[in-house]
């Protein structure tokens, strides 16, 4: 049983959903991003979704683009990110760790090379944000070869065939997008998603985590009430870093408190 399966099994027994924060590795600096991970885990994060800074993030709104810029300003490279991932894995052996990246980052290392690096660093899953499920074959093959779960986005306007492919090809969890567009806490998650979740369930998809626009505990409660296995929050977490990174101690406290509030909302 892999780490995601163990997590969802444990949460089901506890009658809880998962809360998964997203942050950019290297934001605002590599060392501070390790302290940020510690604060998220201390607040109760069930898993982590982590980004590698990229210069042209098409699915990201201004908040997460800003995180990438801060990471670039602190000279964070992909190699630095893999080194950070290894340190996070060593500290948290049971925590599911996912990467959310763009195809160029994978391609520049050769696809097999990228997934091998993920395996060596202890990464559980990879979501390539700009590769739709219909075009995923080389990425999926490399992921399978190196024991990495492939995460796919179930779009809000996806037809049955797309959702069926997402269900059949995905492992770990399904990234359920609550609305079209780019990431951002400024634009609220579009509910309801029960229909999408039911369709995914019919196709035996991995557990669905709802993302895009999740910034408040009430949205986490609504997602779980709609049948999601949990929720992912990126922009709202990164916004705390953006606002308070000049005062690291205060920032880390705010992050921990935010996660505590969101995690408390996962009780079924």
From Swiss-Prot:
It comes from Aeromonas hydrophila subsp. hydrophila (strain ATCC 7966 / DSM 30187 / BCRC 13018 / CCUG 14551 / JCM 1027 / KCTC 2358 / NCIMB 9240 / NCTC 8049). HAMAP family: Trp_synth_alpha. One of its GO terms (molecular function) is tryptophan synthase activity. GO terms for cellular component: cytosol. Pathway: Amino-acid biosynthesis; L-tryptophan biosynthesis; L-tryptophan from chorismate: step 5/5. Keywords: Amino-acid biosynthesis, Aromatic amino acid biosynthesis, Lyase, Tryptophan biosynthesis. The lineage of its organism: Bacteria, Pseudomonadati, Pseudomonadota, Gammaproteobacteria, Aeromonadales. It catalyses: (1S,2R)-1-C-(indol-3-yl)glycerol 3-phosphate + L-serine = D-glyceraldehyde 3-phosphate + L-tryptophan + H2O. Tetramer of two alpha and two beta chains. It comes from the Bacteria. The alpha subunit is responsible for the aldol cleavage of indoleglycerol phosphate to indole and glyceraldehyde 3-phosphate. It is an enzyme of class 4 (lyase). This is Tryptophan synthase alpha chain. The active site is at residues 49, 60. Disulfide bonds: none annotated. Belongs to the TrpA family. NCBIfam families: trpA (TIGR00262). InterPro entries: Aldolase_TIM, RibuloseP-bd_barrel, Trp_synthase_alpha_AS, Trp_synthase_suA. Its EC number is 4.2.1.20.
């Amino acid at each position: 049983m892999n780490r995601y399966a163990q997590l969802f099994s444990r949460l089901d027994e506890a009658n809880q959903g998962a809360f998964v924060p997203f942050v950019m590795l290297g934001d605002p600096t590599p060392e501070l991003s390790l302290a940020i991970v510690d604060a998220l885990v201390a607040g109760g994060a069930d898993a982590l979704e982590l980004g590698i800074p990229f210069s042209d993030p098409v699915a990201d709104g201004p908040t997460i683009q800003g995180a990438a810029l801060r990471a670039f300003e602190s000279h964070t490279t992909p190699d630095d990110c893999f080194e950070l991932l290894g340190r996070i894995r060593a500290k948290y052996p049971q925590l599911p760790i996912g990467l959310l990246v763009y195809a160029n980052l994978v391609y520049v290392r050769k696809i097999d090379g990228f997934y091998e690096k993920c395996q060596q660093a202890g990464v559980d899953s990879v979501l390539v944000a700009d590769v739709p499920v219909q075009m995923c074959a080389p990425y999926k093959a490399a992921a399978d070869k190196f024991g990495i779960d492939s995460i796919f986005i179930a779009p809000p306007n996806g037809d049955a065939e797309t959702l069926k492919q997402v269900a059949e090809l995905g492992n770990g969890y399904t990234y359920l997008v609550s609305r079209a567009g780019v990431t951002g806490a400024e634009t609220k998650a579009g509910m309801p998603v029960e229909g999408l979740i039911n369709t995914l369930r019919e196709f035996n998809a991995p557990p669905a985590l709802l993302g895009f626009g999740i910034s408040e505990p009430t949205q986490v409660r609504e997602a779980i009430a709609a049948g999601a296995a949990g929720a992912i929050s990126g922009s709202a977490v990164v916004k705390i870093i953006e606002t308070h990174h000049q005062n690291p101690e205060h920032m880390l406290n705010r992050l921990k408190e935010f996660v505590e509030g969101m995690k408390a909302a996962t009780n079924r």
